[in-house]
């Protein structure tokens, strides 16, 4: 009995067809594919499931593999999904404590996900319901820095009431990115009152 393993086939670059704005580096890292490595068909069985987990792209049709002598090239058919949002109301009201003055009031929510094609996230929530009161929450996240399985994120929370109370929370985190959307996070934070 003789086992013929056949020729070595290595993974080549990917082709993304469709209107999806996504970096090939991010896509390969997210799907745990490494260009230049030996092609392993079992890696491709879960790709469609992994792509469904992404909030900003959808498969227009199942991916295909193009074979060339010694190379395998995945072809993805991806469409953008709306993952970013903006919601807000801003107004001006008279300030009863200071005659003739006004203050800005409002509630604004802005979420930008994958705006630059690298799966980055920017999230801002601002709320100013009363005079001299501010509530601000900002989150930023950037995965796969320099194509490595590491990401960085930053959180800022600010709450101000009048001139007597100010609370600021800051947090800087580093993530080791695992398969799918899972990660291990290490962070440092500072809280001031």
Regions found by a protein language model. Name each.
Residues 21-35:
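N-terminal periplasmic "start-of-domain" segments of outer-membrane beta-barrel proteins
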């Amino acid at each position: 009995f003789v086992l013929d393993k056949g020729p070595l086939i290595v993974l080549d670059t990917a082709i993304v067809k469709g209107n999806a704005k996504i970096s090939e580096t991010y896509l390969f890292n997210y799907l745990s594919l490494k260009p230049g490595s030996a092609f392993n068909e079992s890696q491709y069985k879960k790709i469609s499931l992994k792509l469904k987990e992404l909030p900003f792209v959808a498969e227009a049709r199942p991916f295909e593999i193009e074979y060339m002598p010694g190379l395998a090239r995945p072809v993805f058919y991806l469409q953008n999904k709306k993952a970013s949002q903006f919601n807000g109301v801003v107004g001006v009201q008279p300030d009863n404590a200071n005659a003739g003055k006004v203050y800005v009031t409002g509630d604004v929510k802005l979420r930008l996900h994958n705006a630059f094609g690298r799966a980055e996230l920017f999230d801002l929530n601002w709320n100013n319901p009363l005079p001299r009161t501010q509530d601000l929450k900002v989150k930023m996240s950037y995965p796969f820095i320099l194509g490595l399985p590491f990401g960085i994120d930053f959180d800022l929370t600010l709450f101000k009431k009048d001139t007597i109370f100010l609370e600021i929370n800051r947090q800087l985190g580093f993530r080791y990115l695992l398969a799918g959307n899972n990660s291990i996070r290490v962070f440092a934070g500072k809280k001031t009152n």
